Amino acid sequence: MLASVSEGLAKRTSKALLMSRVRVLVGTRKGAFVLTADGKRASWSIEGPHFPGWEIYHVKGSPVDPNRIYASQTSTWFGQVMQRSNDGGATWDVLGNTFAYDGVTGTHQWYDGTPHRWDFARVWHLEPSLHDPDTVYAGVEDAALFRSTDGGATWSELSALRTHGTASQWQPGAGGMCLHTILIDPQHPQRMYAAISAAGAFRSDDAGASWTPINRGLRSEQIPDHDAEVGHCVHRLALHPARPNVLFMQKHWDVMRSDDGGDMWYEISGNLPTDFGFPIDVHAHEPDTIYVVPITSDSYHYPPDGKLRVYRSRCGGNEWEPLTNGLPQRNCYVNVLRDAMAVDTLDACGIYFGTTGGSVYVSPDGGDRWDEIVRDLPAVLSVEVQTLA
């Protein structure tokens, strides 16, 4: 009897996996790619490149309507182009491409500490609304936050962030002064988080009307005042939707955690081989299980010892284990960028990441085993995943 019950459960689980689907949205230096599979995540269909030859900094789908996908297409020669798909990435429409700072822009600090005028360069990050497929936020370089409420046709700046009293002290990081992370609190819709290289992390409790720096506890040896209110090079923020007051951060150096919405941070780097890196993410069903990819240093943008290793903590930090099964463990000198890691929400949570060497990996079991979905793409800038019924 027990055997038949177990067999029945296994069959139902297998059927559910076959009926489920995942869609992985990959932005690269030379176009976007769409990878799809059933819930087993063993056999993949690869479509693309969409927008060949263009830098696709970010592609992300709406949590309300998974067929609604937004993409940032950019070129130093041709400028910024926004794209939208209403059919899951099969076809695309050009949207509004005007990003105008509101009012007098003022200045921020340049690399040498001199004043520098705000100049729009590109859209780094897109964050669709949790409730409305026509509302989407855009984080841009030079750092500012924009919003569209008409599906990307027009964009308006939420200027309270850029005009914050500390903005004149902000400086670009090595990749520019970019607003690269936008998080929306699913339990408190008025609360948002933004992260800027190299200004730090900020929180709004009124849907972007005002902002507070949330950098207490951060320490950065690279800036004159190591404990300054702003000026920290935050690489990425992450939260779990069931516990949005707990934030995780990958900083230029240091992996950090806050248990009070960013009011105070403490270090959780623990036994990592190096605490420099770019992405950080949280398991879909385990709020204390987090993932990072240690990189040797800010001078050597490749994994320690040429071994590509994701590290997992099951206790919210400090205690980390290397995840290597299926990943190259010799002569691997790639980087994993800040937007290039994502998780799905299937029962067996899948973890995904892409490399500057053009590989995209999946772990269908929370990191225990890795499979290479595709290789030899252009350098991967972003990875997002949609879990489809």
Model-predicted regions and their roles:
Residues 1-389:
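Extracellular glycan-interacting surfaces
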